[in-house]
Each structure stands twice: as structure tokens, then as C-alpha cells.
Amino acid sequence: MKNLSFLTLFAFLSVGFVVADEPVDEDVEVVAEATMSESSDAADDEDVQELGRVSVTGSRIKRVDIEGATPLITITRADIDNAGFQTVYDAVSNLTQNTGSVNGENFQAGFNASLQPINLRDFGPGRTLVLVNGKRTADYPFPYNGESASFNWGAIPLAAVERIEVLTSGASSIYGSDAVAGVVNVILVDGLERQTARVVAGGGVNAGSGGETLNLEFAGGGFGERYSYTYALEYYDEKAVPISSRSEHDSYKDAQDGGLPSRGLLIRDQFAGAFNHYTPDELIDGLTAPFDPSSGLVPTAGLSCQDAGDYFAPTETEIGNYVPFAVGAWCAIDTSSNGSLTNERKRTAAFLSGTYELTDSVEAYAKYVYLETDTIGTLDNLFTPFVWVAGPQRYGRQDSYWRPNTSTNPATGGFQFDPGYSAFMDFRIQKIFPGVYRGSSYVEDTSTIDFGLRGVLNNGYEWDVSYTENTYDVVQTGRNFLASALYDKIHNIGGVDGFGNPCVLDTNDLLDGDPSNGEVDDWWGIYGYSASYSQPNCYNWDFYLSTQTQADAEALRVDNVEPADAFSELFQATLTGDLMQLPYGPLGFAAVIENQTKGYEVNLSELNKQGLLWGIGGVDGGGERERNAVGVEFNVPVSENVLISLSTRWDEYDDAVVDVDRRTAGATMEWRPKDNVLVRASWSESFKAPDLPYSFVGERRFFTSQTDWYQCWYDGNFGNGGENCGGAYGIINIEGFTTGNLGLKEEEGDSYAVGVVWEPMDRMVVTIDAFHIQLGDIVSTKSLGALTLDEAVCRARAAGDTLDAFPDYPDSYCSQVIGNIVRGGKDFTVNPTPEGSITQIYETPVNIAGQEFLGIDTAVSYAWVTDKAGDFNFSVFSSHQIDLKYAEDVGDPLLSYMNNTYTPRSRQSLRLGWSRGDWGAGMSVLRVGHMEYL
């Protein structure tokens, strides 16, 4: 389905749609990208105007020529309007260089369901530097994916934007950390002379498609003898796009493999490996576990899937596809269309700026931006945990043992079912609630104040001294099952069992509990299960086998409120001018001094911290860091048509524990063999300081299952590479923790670009640029499977076994790995290790990974001016990824991942525009190229 978005701006109409040879996202529109040689007003005036010296992103030295040594894209406010975009995020997310995948509002189950990030060149959201008026801002408060930093493009009001400049190559020698894949600089509006009102409405042409938008703007300003002022107000309202509105996603049958429905009501006999068999007419009680003392049967006879809720009986094919569960069946539910593709969002914003001339050579300026956003996202159907109804199986390893026969509940003295092998009971049950959904809401407040002085010295040098403060506050609210209430409901705690005994919780009911020594584990963990070993007759069948209303589910849930905040305080001073006159022109010079303090804090709720909520994780923590930087640039004209630029910068980061400093250098070249040809090249060292969350993230708790490679080696079954360590060495319900690492160092790399700009005729520009970006020592968390394997290798080598098939690990690494894996648990193997089985695993971020990008950007733009028919504009842009490589660990070779799922080969955009007097129309198209679907 193609969606058309209509823009009404006075008498202006814009239409946007998407095409692709393999449709990937048919609801995305693209920004009209323009090189700096292209002006939005170029077609309105055929007279060539003399340009003054201006400063553009990529260098602090002002220049006359708009095209320079570094590839730059400029998106003006007119370009945004012509493309039909209504937000800054729309504009930047549709850059052809935005080829990487992200987890934001498109992934409601993640840590950042209100975030709108971009990912240039697939280096990650945190490796593109974002500036506002050339100055750094605060990060999004919640860590990206729970571990790194990112910028939220939904936090900049469009009403305050004059243009967006995008440097598409690395530039750490100019801007410092984060400028790896590029720099995006948002220039705020200034110097308005009249009042302007905008009313913009958009939406899909098909009823119920969602995404309807309304944007109201009012802006104005004025000038006095020595002052100027500008203001803008904005209100933005966007409806959610439900998954059900997209025909390619509204049924489980849309999946490429034919699709399978979800198992909405599941009752599985673990011991028999079967399910109770449900048909459209009857829930057949094919299993005879003594849940009901009167009949000895599961109370499902005579029930249908429809009786238990909005379920349906799966087909025999669907049953068989759930291997190895083809013995029985289950009640099915279609959950594929639940949730939202984009959030419901309301935003209000205010912007105010002004200048005042203190003297003829000194000016004071100030800018203030405030934005409040309310966001609501929907994830999927509410569901219960898997529940073990009965059975004496104990999990410490993937082995089981029989608890001694007993007929007395130690807590109540009543009869309990555990008579021995003949009546072994072990049922796993889960229910997905029809019509009851999970989701979160976010309230965000951001404010920025920027004020300073700027002027011109007697020798012509221009200077600017400023202070910028940015704050970002977010409150996330969700509704989650209170674990105790859910447990009480499922197991009828407070009621009586089939024999009249009170239904209570005792140590036999706790997952992995050992009654002989009082050992218990939390059954309400993120991936934990509740159990009813002692009193299976207390199980609340009505909770599963009857229709549950939303009110029934809501009664078991509580609000979970978790705030987060981030801030940035920046002092910046710049100086630019001409040092001296050289034979071929002036020696340009620019210098910058910066001091920035930034920080963040995430506060999990006490319920979440204590593990009292079911089905939710989280990560808390916080910290701050001070950064000092000094940079300098020189423009050296070496001939009439060759200009060389040199830059260097020193950054020092102090997080009160570890100091990180980095010196970077860069160079660019411009060669103009003809008036209409520019050959350019650039190189810059790149670096990224460790993200604050990587260093200061609080403890994140989870549960995992892993192979005990060390036990396998200890038993003599390891072989050359652990190929004999199968399921017998698996351990489930290992408690895991993620913590920060204050000992991280900076990521380092290089960025290269070479290209040509050609103007074959008036008003036509062609550009071709090739890029090569390398980055090493990337901060990442090693997979838990790799950690447990490396632990075995380190312990084996310490015992004298060389294990030549594995790389050489330094002693420091082995000490860290062994320390991250906690042992001491009971081991029920014949030959247990002296250290015991794994009980806990700690993962910490480390500098281990590497990445490389090779690609080409091309662009063609043309403006055709007529006397009567109006003015026509045409632009087409393309970003082609030649190769993407990644290494997961130190010493690993860089391997191409171009054939990975959802890695696009290219992205193209097209813009068409027409204007005549007060009328105009525009169309923008985005194409996402071929990618693998595995």
C-alpha cells in the first residue's frame, strides 16, 4: 500500500510516497537533500549574487566558496516543507546515508520506545555527532539498548529550525569525540522580520491507516536600531500507526514462511512432551494428571477454544510446524497485528532568540528553546509467565532428580501429590490475554539556553564566547503485573485446595528450591517461572479456562514509574581570521576552546529494583564527566587553484575515576582545475570517548542458560574446540548481571573521503564522493557464550592444557573473565569441578570490536527556470554501500556482513519541485535497495 501525505501550507501542496524493488518500509518519505551549491531560491533569481564569507559545518574558517573539501548536505526549511515533512526527525531519518538499523519507537519491547534516532553508515546512533548552532547538547537520558548514548531527533521543534547541515564524513580533528560517521548541525532560525503562520496536516489516503498529523506553527520577529528578536511557537499532534493498518503485517499468515499463530492457551505435559488437544468443538482431556480430586482429570472436558477467550483451534499443519510439539495441540491467537509501528505523540514547543549591539564591534545574543512531548506506545498482548503446575523435577543442570516420596505438605500438614513415578505430574501452562495490551507512556521536557558575546577585533579577527545549558527530563510509565498478585491469582493463595487445605506458598513451590537445606530462588525473576509443586489442586483453572476481561487483568497490574534525566553545560570560545597574506591568498586560521560537563541518571522504581514486577527488566545508573578541548585549523593556499587545510585537536575527558585524552589530526585538499570542477579529498583521525552509560550503568539483572565448557573440559570431553560439549553440560536459570566499566579507553579510527563536484551547465551540479571509515577498540559486551568458553580456555591453560585451537589470551583478560563467572553451585555430575557449577555471570563492556565501511555517495541536481510555466527543480541522491565489515573480538579478522538480514545495499532519494508565484508543489521519493531476508 502506498501512502500519500498532503501538505497544506497556504496554497502549497506537497505529495510524498515510497517505491522500492523490494518494499522495506513503504510509509517513509525522504528529505530533499541539497548540496551547498544548491539554493532554495536559486530558481527565483537568475542574477549571480556575490557571496560573503560564511561558516559552514566541516570547518570553523569562513570561506567564499560554498562547496569545499568535505562533502556537505544542506537541508533548508524550504526543502523540508517541499518534501512534505513535518518534523526534524522526518528530514534527517530520510538521508540516504542513514543506512543502519536502530531500536527506537519501532521496537516497543526495548529500552527506548520513545526514541527517534538515526544511524549513519551503520556505525551506531552514538557515532554521529549532533550539534545545535555548532554546540553539543545533552544525550537522551535512557541508555540506548540499555548500554550506550544516543540523541533523540524528536527533541528539536521544526518551528525553530532554519536549516540542517550534514557532514557525511568523520571530523574528529575539528569537532572531537563522536564525529566518526558524520556530523549533523542544526542551525536555529534567526532574524525574522514578519509574522508567519503555518498549518500543516497529513495522513494516509486509506481509512484507518493511522499516522494522521497536525502541525501548527506561528513565528515572527523584528529589528530595532541595535537589536533584533525572533520567536516561534509550535504544536504537533501525531496519531499512532497501528500494525493492523498495514496489510502486509496484519496477519500471522503474512510471514514469508507461511506464518504460525501464537500459542494463546497452552497446557503442556512436560513429562509426556505433549499438549492437551483442543479442537473447535471441545478441549479434549487426553491427559490424566490428578488436578481434580473428584475426576482425576484436567477440567477441560467439553470446553472449546472460544469458551476460554478469543482463541481458535490451529490447523493440523500449524500444529505440526511447532516441532517437537506435534503430539498435541493448543488454542491459537493471532498477535501479529497488535502494537504500533509509530507512537502517538503530542508536542508543544517555544523558541525565543535575540541580539543586541553593545558597541559597533560587540554583540550580545541569546537563544532559548523549550519542548514538551507526550508519547504513547503499544507493544503486544499481555501474557502470563509459564507456570509449572506440579512435578518434582529440579533444575540446577539440565538433569532431573526425584524428590523423596512424601504425602504431607510441610507448611500445612495437608496431603500433597508426589506419590512417586506412577503419578509424576509436570505441566507448563501459559495464557495470552486477547484484547489486553502492554505499552508505555513517556513525558519528556527539554530546555536549552544559549547566550554569549561575539564581535570583531581591530585586526579583523572574529571571536565568539558563549555558555550553553541543556537539560532533558523523561518520565516513563508502564503497567506491569505485580508478581505477588499474579502468583496469588494463579495458585489461589488464600483459598483452599481440593482437600480443604489452605493454599499457601512453601519452599517446595519455589523454583530450584531445595527443601533439605532451605535453599530458595526467586520465582518472579525476569525469565523465572512460578511453580506449584506441593499443592497442584490449588491451581486456579478458571484464570486460564474462562474469558478474562481487561478489568480482570488490570486488577493484577500496577503503575511502574521510572524517571531519567540528562544535562550538558558547555563553555565555548572561538577565534577565526586571516593570520597573514601568502602569495596565493590569505592564511586562514581558526581556534576553539571548550569546557563541557555532561551527565545522566536513570532511577528504576523500587518495585523493579527488588524484582517484584513480572515481565520487565531495566537498567539504572548515572554519572557525569568533564571534557576540556583545544583545537586549531589552518587554510593554506598553495597555488591559484589548490587549497590545503590542516587541523588538530586535543580532548581530555575526566569522569572522576579514569582520565581519557586523545589528540587527533586531519587534512583536506581542494583542487579546482577548472571553474566548474572541484576535486576534493579529506582525511581525519576519528575517536569516540566511552559513552557515560558504558562506564556508569547500574547493575542490570537477568537470567540466562549457558553451556558449562569448563565442566566439559574437566570431564575430558572438550576435544579440540568444545565440539563434544552438548546439552548434557547445559545450565539454566543462571543469574546474570551487567555492570559498567570505568576502565574503558577511547575508540580510535580514521576517515577518508575523495570526490568530484562538477557543474556541466548553469544550475546543474553533479557530485561523486567515495568514503572509507575504519574504527577500532569499539566498546561492546562480549556474548555470554563466548565468556563461558573463554573461561574454560583460561582455566585449562592455567592447568597446563595448551588448547592450541584458541587464540592467546593475555593474563589480564583471563583474570577478568574468570572473575566475571561466579561458581560455587551444586554440581550433580559424577566428576564435579572443585569450583562448583556456574551460579552467576557478570558481563561488562570492553574495548574489543572493530568496524569498517566502504561506500560511494552520488548526487545530481538541476533547476529549470521558465518565464511563464514557473520554475522546476530536480534532485536525485544515492548512497551505495560497497562493503561493511565487523570484528566481534580482539584479534578476530574483519568479516563482511553485507549479506546479513536487513543490510541494504543502497538508498536513493528523488525530489521534484515546481513553483510559480504563490503556488507550488513538490514530491519526494525514497527507495531502499536490495537486502537479504533470511
Region locations from a protein language model:
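N-terminal periplasmic "start-of-domain" segments of outer-membrane beta-barrel proteins
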Residues: 52-83, 89, 140-145, 195-198
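Surface-exposed beta-strand-turn/loop segments characteristic
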Residues: 90-96, 100-114, 123-125, 135, ...
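Hydrophobic, lipid-facing positions within transmembrane beta-strands of outer-membrane proteins
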Residues: 116, 182, 212-218, 227, ...
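Short loop/turn motifs that connect adjacent beta-strands in outer-membrane beta-barrel proteins
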Residues: 191-195, 225-226, 359-362, 456-462, ...
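Transmembrane beta-strands of outer-membrane beta-barrel proteins
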Residues: 195-199, 229-231, 360, 364-366, ...
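Transmembrane beta-strands of outer-membrane beta-barrel pores
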Residues: 201-205, 224-226, 235-239, 370-374, ...
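Structural signature of Gram-negative outer-membrane beta-barrels, strongest in the C-terminal barrel
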Residues: 479-492, 594-595, 621-717, 724, ...
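Gram-negative outer-membrane beta-barrel transporters
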Residues: 771-933
